[in-house]
Amino acid sequence: MTTQFKPELLSPAGSLKNMRYAFAYGADAVYAGQPRYSLRVRNNEFNHANLKIGIDEAHSLGKKFYVVVNIAPHNSKLKTFIKDLQPVIDMKPDALIMSDPGLIMLVRENFPNIDIHLSVQANAVNWATVKFWKQMGLTRVILSRELSIDEIAEIRQQVPDIELEIFVHGALCMAYSGRCLLSGYINKRDPNQGTCTNACRWEYKMEEGTTDDVGNIVPKIDPAQQIEVKNVAPTLGEGAVTDKVFLYTESQKPDEQMTAFEDKHGTYFMNSKDLRAVQHVEKLTALGVHSLKIEGRTKSFYYCARTAQVYRKAIDDAAAGKPFDESLMDTLESLAHRGYTEGFLRRHTHDEYQNYEYGYSISDRQQFVGEFTGKRNEQGMAEVAVKNKFLLGDNVEMMTPQGNINFKIEKMLNRKNETVDAALGDGHFVFLNVPQDINLNYALLMRNLVNTNTRNPHSN
């Protein structure tokens, strides 16, 4: 059964290049942060000049561009807010994504015609909250990641005349929809001001502690007691409760000790798995969710391209009434990730949300190794700008907006027209044989991995 309704595919844009790849692979819209006022102050290419370029390019393609203004501002940020926002408003973005009621009030007073989308940072978790923000004049609410599909359905039923947006892919925060103080506490970098250092991903050590005469937790001086967190299996509610107290340290700051406790649920460590909800696109489409959002403004252009391609197909299939293509789940395994979870869309045990073993992203399926430049040599071979090492004889996938092909590398030339057996890494260029009728614009190259992973891609 086909449906006229098709959700918007909303991709992250940490740079103009990421935006262009997202659009090429099927995104309907992108979001990017305003300087000083978004939660991605670090790794944000978008100054006012680039925002103008991005918004104009998006509109020329019939796409949309949303500007994120979602910090929790202190008084000092209010002094220049309207003055700083005026040039952005003049660029005519399609909406502002905002969380702070005070900033929203100022925008409504000064720029009444701009659409405002409520940021996930505002933690909208019930239909009454959504209805309130509709009455305040907002046109879309980005629902909290902590909601189940049934709760989303009830919100849709109770407030049918406002747009809803849901995160379907990307990193999850161990705090409630990102409202975290961990980085501020440990590293003096306030996540709510856009300077999160991802302290929840760091590697920590645990050692047994003891309590002193006044009840403070202090080190138990016995180096033999020191253990690695990753070697301790979590109890996850099944182990016996312990009255032991612990101290933990981050590997880069061994002299700074923090306290930890264990209860019937285990010791709480903070590394969430990544969200992957492509299998729920059909259901979310049927519910009338207007926008399906991919997290990742600090991710690579390859990530933007691959996620856009996968979720584009899932949305198109759902709108056409086609059954879910389970191979899309496997395709997303090719991206480096911290383990996948469905998040809170369905209820799971604790270990299905958390990764207790490592904090880095990894894939054992593929590694992104090259970007096609669009050029061909006199023999018609396509040029690749190498990003990671690959070898003659490797099996690779070539990804393009028109479709993907797999092949084995049987010949490579360098720019001197010399035969080479290795593309050595970033900064090198090689030529490969690919079909002449393939459009090389936005084409990417991935190496298929066998019995290895992206942490040690050439270990076998």
Curated annotation (Swiss-Prot):
Pfam families: Peptidase_U32, Peptidase_U32_C. InterPro entries: Peptidase_U32 (IPR001539), Peptidase_U32_C (IPR032525), RNA/ubiquinone_mod_enzymes (IPR051454). The keyword Methyltransferase does not apply. It comes from the Bacteria. Its EC number is 3.4.-.-. Belongs to the peptidase U32 family. This is tRNA hydroxylation protein P. It comes from Haemophilus influenzae (strain ATCC 51907 / DSM 11121 / KW20 / Rd).
